[in-house]
């Protein structure tokens, strides 16, 4: 059984026009199996953010293919792309992007609400993920009432609560 969750196959990304091309990603290939963690390291300007933007469908590749659970995401457009982002990706932003007017519980449950999850399921899953990340004590707090580490774990909970293929 192939448990490859992500396969990046010979991708390239260029910016600019024909007379002034910048190569941001040059023939990158790798795969990640379910449960594995991947770290991407490199100097400034080496293409790390561009690579992640292509994997997350924020940007498109110039050539090559990216497969998530065997599906070529470089061919997705419109509603297929929106559906993929909503169901298969979980984002944790560097600055967390928690909504200041919502409690931790509401920030986490928002991802489930957007995904169309039933309220009874939301009431079950939010406490489960909060327990797993040891943030039960902040569920009724607003972001300004939490430490940076607590905010980071709430953002991680929000990204993971929908069980995406990739975080």
Where are the regions a protein language model picked out?
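ABC family nucleotide-binding domain
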Residues: 4-167
């Amino acid at each position: 059984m192939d448990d490859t969750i992500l396969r990046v196959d010979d991708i390239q990304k260029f910016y600019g026009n024909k007379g002034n091309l910048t190569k941001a990603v040059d023939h990158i290939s790798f795969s990640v199996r379910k449960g594995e963690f991947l770290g991407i390291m490199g100097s400034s300007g080496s293409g790390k953010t561009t690579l992640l933007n292509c994997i997350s469908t924020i940007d498109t590749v110039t050539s090559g293919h990216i497969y998530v659970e065997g599906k070529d995401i470089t061919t997705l457009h419109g509603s297929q792309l929106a559906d993929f982002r909503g169901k298969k990706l979980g984002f944790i932003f560097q600055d967390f992007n928690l909504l200041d007017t919502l409690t931790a519980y509401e920030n986490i449950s928002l991802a489930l609400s957007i995904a169309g999850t039933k309220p009874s399921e939301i009431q079950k899953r939010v406490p489960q993920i909060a327990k797993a990340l040891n943030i039960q004590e902040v569920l009724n707090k607003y972001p300004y009432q939490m430490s940076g580490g607590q905010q980071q774990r709430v953002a991680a909970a929000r990204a993971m609560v929908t069980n995406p293929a990739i975080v």
